Structures are given as C-alpha cells and as structure tokens.
C-alpha cells in the first residue's frame, strides 16, 4: 500500500474490497456505499452481502436478493445521469449451501458424483452448519465473481463472526481438513490396495458408531467416498483465494463503531492482517457522536446547575424567568451528557489510527436517520470520498 492512500484510491483502483469487523457496526452499509460509489465512477461493481434482512435489498430498489448477482436499475443509483456509461451496479446475498453446491459441481468428475454428494445427508448438514462454512463460501463467491463475473470491483460484506479473522482462516481450515489423517483414512475404504489401512478405518468407525449411531456413520462414510478425487481441486481453489486476497489489487477495510470492544477488535484485526503481510488500507469508525463544541462536561454541568439555581430563585420570587431557566438548564444538561459520550468515544479511539498503520481513517457521525435509500448511502459516502463536506472528528 502506498503512503497516503485514500478511500478514493481504493474505490477507483482496487478490484476487491473486503469490509470486515464485528457484527452490528455497519459493514453492510459501508459495503453498499463502496459499490455505489464505484458504479458512479464508471466501474462495473457488485456488492456481496451476508445480511438476510431485506433492508439492503429495499435500499437498492429490489424486492429481494438471491445468490445470483442482480443488476440494479441505473435510475435508482444515478437519477441525474451523471455517471459514466460504463458504470454498473449489481448485488447478491450469499446463499452458503447454493455456493457450496456450485463448488461441488465444479470439481466433481461427472454429474453422478455431484448428485451423490448433494443427496448425502451428512453433506446437507455440513454445507450449512459446519463452523467456518459461511466464511469460506463468502471467499469462494468473491473469487467466482472476480474470475468469471466480468466485474472490475467486487465488494464483500464479511460474515458477522465473533473473530473477524475467521474469514481469512476459512480456506486454511479447509486445507487442514483435507490434509487431516482421519479424512484421508475415511477415503481409503474404496481403494483395494489399502486393505490394511481400510481394516483400521473399520475398527475406528465401529468405535465411533457406538457414540453417534450407525446411520450417521454410514452417511459420513458415503460422503467421503463420494468426495474421492475432488480434494485436490478444493485445495487448489483455497490456495487461489488466499493468493488473490494477498494481491495489491485487493483491499481490506475495517469497519468499527466507537464502542470499546469493537475498537479493540478492529485494532487486533488490523495487527493480525499486518502480521500476514496484508495491510489494512481503510479504517471506518461508524456512528460517532459529535462533540458539540469545546466546553467540557464539567463546565456544561456547572451551567445547568447555575440555571437550576436561578429557576429555584425565580420560583421563590414568583417571577417569569423560571420556565426559561428550566428549559435552558435542561438543554445544557443534555449537552453535557452528549459531550460525555463523545469524550468516552474519543478515549476508546485514542491510538487506533496508529495501530492501523498507514490506513486511511474516516469517522462517520451518528446520522439523524436510518440508512434506507440511495440518498442516505450518498450521505455516508460524503464522509469517505473527496466530495465530502467537513468531516466529524472525535474531540473536534
């Protein structure tokens, strides 16, 4: 990453943008903002979301989203017609099982092998419920769109995992599974020249079946037998995905909120990425409370107390100033509360920019309305890109 990278550089020059962070910090919104801005600058952009809520679909002018990219009507995101004609915007919602099914079909030797795997009960469970499956399929969908979709900007909203690094670890976990001794043993019963090992496997399976039941074991064995011959394709694909994310054309943007836990998770993620030689290029802190001036909390509370005293004095004198003093005092008390929240957030954010290295940093304020349409997405974008007005900086 070059010195002084900006969010404009990311949206104009990168081919892949991965928005990551803990759940509930606005990743889906930020991903949509990047895709819309890319389209407005003439890029063929697609946003991949994992959020099953229909709010993003409604924002983009769609009734729903599916696992297939759907192009959004240009009049929705470019009503003035100012964007270059090359600009296009599409969106899809990741369907983990459908993506896994497609991957199986890609590496199966024939349709018969594909159908045997898809019909297997063990496969139907692991394709949706196995830990890390959603993260890996998000990576797979990203790779598929980049390689075969014709898009020059793919923006991914990563799954809301407790630890954001699960997204990066997913391909490696799959590789470790394929290289696992038990996995290889389960593949052996179909190979006649490994009868000794096969006998050992049978003893192992009989022991396990006493715990989980024979029917479950039969499904597992049938799955691994059907999977035979596909492991190398899956292993190569996982390596290709990791290589793609390590390229300079890929960018990681960490999204956080000012909450202490979210900030710490974001900083930790940035540091771990750096250890893997994958620098974070952007850090976006979402829903920041403005400071509302320079006066400190104590000064504001003192003003509120002074006005409260004036109210009491006016009430004793039966004067007319009691009501106005009461209202103004209440406003100062509210302002002090907001100022205290802003100071607490500033404390949480202290040093986060340094921990993010040379990443571009933006603070998006707590907006007065929810992000539910393209105008609201544009409002968020003003705090990221060159057309932005003066930006809200914590403590300023």
Where are these predicted regions, by residue range?
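C-terminal lobe/tail of nucleotide-utilizing enzymes
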Residues: 1-11, 202, 209-225, 235-396
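Nucleotide-state-sensitive switch-loop elements of NTP-binding domains
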Residues: 2-18, 25, 30-235, 239
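Short, charged/polar micro-motifs that form catalytic or ligand-binding hotspots
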Residues: 24, 129-132, 256-259, 263
């Amino acid at each position: 990453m070059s010195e002084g990278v900006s969010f404009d550089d990311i949206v104009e020059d990168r081919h892949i943008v991965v928005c990551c962070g803990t759940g509930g910090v606005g990743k889906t919104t930020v991903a949509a903002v990047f895709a819309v801005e890319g389209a407005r600058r003439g890029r063929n952009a697609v946003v991949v979301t994992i959020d099953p809520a229909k709010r993003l679909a409604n924002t983009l002018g769609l009734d729903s989203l599916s696992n297939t990219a759907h192009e959004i009507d240009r009049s929705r995101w470019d009503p003035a017609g100012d964007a270059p004609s090359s600009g296009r915007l599409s969106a899809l919602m990741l369907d983990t099982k459908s993506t896994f099914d497609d991957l199986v079909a890609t590496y199966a030797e024939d349709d018969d092998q594909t159908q045997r795997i898809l019909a297997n009960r063990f496969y139907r469970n692991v394709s949706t419920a196995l830990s890390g499956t959603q993260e890996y399929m998000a990576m797979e969908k990203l790779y598929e769109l980049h390689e075969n979709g014709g898009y020059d900007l793919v923006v991914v909203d990563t799954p809301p995992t407790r630890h954001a690094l699960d997204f990066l670890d997913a391909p490696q976990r799959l590789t470790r599974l394929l290289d696992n001794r038990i996995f290889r043993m389960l593949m052996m019963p179909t190979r006649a020249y490994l009868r000794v090992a096969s006998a050992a496997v049978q003893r192992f399976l009989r022991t396990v079946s006493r715990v989980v039941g024979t029917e479950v074991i039969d499904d597992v064995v049938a799955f691994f037998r059907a999977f035979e011959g596909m492991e190398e394709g899956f292993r190569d694909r996982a390596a290709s995905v990791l290589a793609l994310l390590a390229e300079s054309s890929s960018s990681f943007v960490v999204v956080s909120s000012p909450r202490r836990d979210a900030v710490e998770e974001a900083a930790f993620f940035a540091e771990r990425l750096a250890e893997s030689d994958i620098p974070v290029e952007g850090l976006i802190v979402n829903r920041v409370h403005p400071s509302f001036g320079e006066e400190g909390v104590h000064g504001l509370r003192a003003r509120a107390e002074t006005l409260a005293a004036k109210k009491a004095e006016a009430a004793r004198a039966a004067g007319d100033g009691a009501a106005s003093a009461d209202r103004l005092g209440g406003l100062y008390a509210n302002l002090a509360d907001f100022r205290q929240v802003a100071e607490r957030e500033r404390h949480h954010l202290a040093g986060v920019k340094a921990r993010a290295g040379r990443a571009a940093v933006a603070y998006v304020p707590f907006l007065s309305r929810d992000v539910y349409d393209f105008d609201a997405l544009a409002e968020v974008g003003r705090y990221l890109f060159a057309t932005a007005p003066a930006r809200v900086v914590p403590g300023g």
